[in-house]
A protein has these predicted regions:
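Extended terminal
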Residues: 1-16, 38, 192-198, 202-279
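Amphipathic hydrophobic-ligand
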Residues: 71-83, 102-111, 136-158, 186-196, ...
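Extracytoplasmic beta-rich ectodomain segments of secreted or membrane-anchored proteins
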Residues: 125-128, 132-181, 185-186
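Terminal hydrophobic membrane-targeting helix
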Residues: 22-106
């Protein structure tokens, strides 16, 4: 056996030993518990089912449930899921999700960015593929929605001010396409939405300070605040939305009925049943 073969055998044995040691040191049940405890400590009640290692650089789970703050109700179920660890990069990991639920479905790829030893700066690059939302309330003129495109989310908090400082966030929309459907009318297509939303999170209140977005058929802004509660019924909205629509580009028979001037819409009430009022 030549020296290269010997080196290869030693490398294989070493890698196998390391993986066995890793599995013994961090069993799956321990890892599931740590993930759930980490989420709960950040007010993100979450339950992971059937987590498995996918050696050498991944993990898979059959189901992830997002719960309400009292852990009595499942708000969303994601399955199956896969996390690809990137050992050559200390700052990012990839999460691939196939979303399956009664009222939603599709796939999302997320690249997570965070300094190795810091807790005050995070980033997420999102790519959504045919993310579908269906079975909206009958009172809503939009009964279904399909979204594709990308987004970049950045969160950071000034270290000098400690944990009392607000989280500062920026959400960048990148070439987002949306299809709004209603069985009674032709679908409305919104293409190439790009924009930026700047916000703060402090004392369970998310405040949108500045925003702008623009697509082929519309442009607009949104400001206001969202008071975060333990569930959808107690998460309260107080938002102001301004839209300017190029009705000729909507591709819908409703275009002729829509106003040519800017729309100003006030969005209030709980997240579960928001109210839209023209102002």
């Amino acid at each position: 056996m030549n020296k290269y073969a010997v080196i290869a055998v030693y490398a294989l044995v070493g890698l196998t030993s390391f993986l066995v040691f890793l599995l013994l040191l961090f069993p799956v049940s321990f890892l599931e518990s740590r993930i759930e405890n980490w989420a709960v400590s950040r007010n993100i009640p979450m339950q992971v089912n059937n987590l498995e290692y996918d050696f050498p650089t991944g993990m898979e789970f059959s189901e992830l449930n997002l719960l309400n703050i009292r852990r009595t109700e499942t708000l969303a179920t994601l399955r199956p899921g896969r996390v690809d660890l990137q050992p050559l990069s200390l700052f990012s990991n990839r999460l691939n999700l196939s979303l399956q639920g009664a009222t939603f479905g599709g796939s999302v790829q997320a690249d997570l960015r965070a300094p190795l030893f810091a807790t005050n700066a995070y980033g997420v690059d999102l790519i959504a593929s045919d993310l579908r939302f269906v079975d909206f309330p009958p009172s809503s003129w939009v009964r279904s929605m399909v979204v594709s495109g990308g987004a970049d989310l950045q969160l950071n908090r000034p270290e000098a001010r400690g944990t009392s400082a607000p989280w500062i966030g920026v959400l960048q929309l990148e070439d987002v396409d949306a299809l709004l459907g209603n069985p009674a009318v032709q679908d409305i297509v919104l293409d190439n939405l790009n924009g930026k939303i700047e916000f703060l999170i402090q004392n369970n209140v998310l405040t949108i300070e500045k925003s702008n977005f623009k697509g082929d058929a519309l442009q607009g802004t949104i400001t206001g605040r969202i008071t975060l509660g333990p569930d959808q019924d107690r998460t309260m909205l107080a938002l102001d939305l301004t839209l300017r629509v190029d009705t000729a580009k909507l591709g819908s028979p409703l275009s002729a009925l829509l106003p040519k001037k800017a729309w100003r819409i006030r969005i209030t009430g709980p997240l579960s049943t928001p109210r839209f009022t023209a102002t």
